[in-house]
UniProtKB/Swiss-Prot annotation:
Disulfide bonds: none annotated. It is found in: Cytoplasm. It comes from Acetivibrio thermocellus (strain ATCC 27405 / DSM 1237 / JCM 9322 / NBRC 103400 / NCIMB 10682 / NRRL B-4536 / VPI 7372). Keywords: Cytoplasm, Ribosome biogenesis. This is Ribosome maturation factor RimP. GO terms for biological process: ribosomal small subunit assembly; translation. InterPro entries: Ribosome_maturation_RimP (IPR003728), RimP_C (IPR028998), RimP_C_sf (IPR036847), RimP_N (IPR028989), RimP_N_sf (IPR035956). The keyword Cytoplasm applies. NCBIfam families: PRK00092.1-2 (NF000928). Its main location: cytoplasm. Required for maturation of 30S ribosomal subunits.
Length: 154
């Protein structure tokens, strides 16, 4: 079974649990770090996720994973908040964080640059749109973008 297939199965398992608590399932990752595998489930809610929220979701999902056993080897389960500088992946993320400062990293340089910062204007027709320097609009084809994340300045 591939990583992608495991992530899809776990997403199907996690969605009802997360929705039951009125949280948002932000992402599911199944990755290998060193010699260990990690199943990471990121959840969020307006106002932010607490440790207690993570614990409740972790326990419920762990019980289901133990019964259904969709992962053929050992792993560590982690449930957490995606953090303030969370990557934006879904169309709903782009809508939710419209008007906020974001960083866009592209795979190949555009005019010699791979990182762009600006106000998120939106997501339309598979393009991410930001406003740089107050009013200069830039559009990025989604498949040419490696990462979009919020920029948090203190």
């Amino acid at each position: 079974m591939t990583r992608k297939e495991i992530e899809e199965i776990v997403t199907e398992i996690a969605n009802p649990v997360v929705n039951k608590h009125s949280f948002e399932l932000v992402d599911v990752e199944f990755i290998k770090e060193g010699s260990s595998w990690y199943l990471r489930i990121y959840i969020d809610k307006p106002g932010g996720i607490t440790i207690d929220d993570c614990q409740v979701v972790s326990e419920e999902i762990s019980d289901i994973l133990d019964k259904e056993d969709p992962i053929p080897h050992s792993y560590f389960l982690e449930v957490s908040s995606p953090g303030l500088d969370r990557p934006l992946k879904k169309e709903s993320d782009f809508e939710r964080f419209k008007g906020e400062l974001v960083e866009v990293k592209v795979f190949k340089p555009i005019e010699g640059k791979k990182i762009f910062e600006g106000e998120l204007v939106g997501y339309k027709d598979n393009k991410i749109i930001i406003k740089k320097n107050g009013n200069e609009l830039m559009e990025f084809e989604r498949d040419k973008v490696a990462l979009v994340r919020r920029v948090i300045k203190f």
